[in-house]
Every structure is written in structure tokens, then in C-alpha cells.
């Protein structure tokens, strides 16, 4: 019997023949991270979904937040949040 071709690529199979393998491997990481559901920082449920570029919406508590283009949190946003939390703790003491 003849062998079938192996299906690879998944979400980025649309870029397969026109672009190189290194490019679609990078795009695969980006597209997987942008389409995953994230944990909502308000209600704690995994319902935060991408609506548009930089806009995420929680289907549980109906909050809409702005973030990074591909991920929910940017590294600079995480640093700012931790600095604000640290300053609030110092103020309370």
C-alpha cells in the first residue's frame, strides 16, 4: 500500500509553501498564543478571549481589557503591576 503524506503545521499550514520553515515556526508560536484562552484577572476563570488586536474580553464577568497584540500580558505591564503592588504594600505599612 502507498503511504499517506504526513499532516504537519496545524494552525500555520496556510503559510507552508510560500514561506520558509523558520518563518512559519515563529508564526506558529504567535498564533497559538494569540488564540488561547487566558485567565481573567478579575474573576479568575479561564474565559479571557481575543476579540480584536490588543482587545481581550472575558465571557464570564463581561470585562474588556487592552493588552498586547498577541498575548494577554506584556512584560512591561507585568513589571508595572508588580511595582504598583509593592508600593501599595509599603504605603500600608
From Swiss-Prot:
Zn-finger segments (C4-type): 40-61
Source organism: Homo sapiens (Human)
GO BP, one annotated term: translation
Keywords in alphabetical order: Metal-binding, Ribonucleoprotein, Ribosomal protein, Zinc, Zinc-finger
Gene: RPL37AP8
Protein family membership: Belongs to the eukaryotic ribosomal protein eL43 family.
Name of this protein: Putative ribosomal protein eL43-like
Annotated Gene Ontology cellular component terms: cytosolic large ribosomal subunit
Biological classification of the source: Eukaryota, Metazoa, Chordata, Craniata, Vertebrata
GO function term, MF aspect, one: structural constituent of ribosome
Pfam families: Ribosomal_L37ae
Amino acid at each position: 500500500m502507498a503511504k499517506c503524506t504526513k499532516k504537519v503545521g496545524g494552525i500555520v499550514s496556510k503559510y507552508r509553501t510560500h514561506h520558509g520553515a523558520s518563518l512559519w515556526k515563529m508564526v506558529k508560536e504567535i498564533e497559538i498564543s494569540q488564540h488561547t484562552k487566558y485567565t481573567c484577572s478579575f474573576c479568575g476563570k479561564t474565559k479571557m478571549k481575543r476579540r480584536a488586536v490588543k482587545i481581550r474580553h472575558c465571557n464570564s464577568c463581561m470585562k474588556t481589557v487592552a493588552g498586547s497584540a498577541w498575548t494577554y500580558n506584556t512584560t512591561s505591564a507585568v513589571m508595572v503591576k508588580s511595582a504598583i503592588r509593592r508600593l501599595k504594600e509599603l504605603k500600608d505599612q
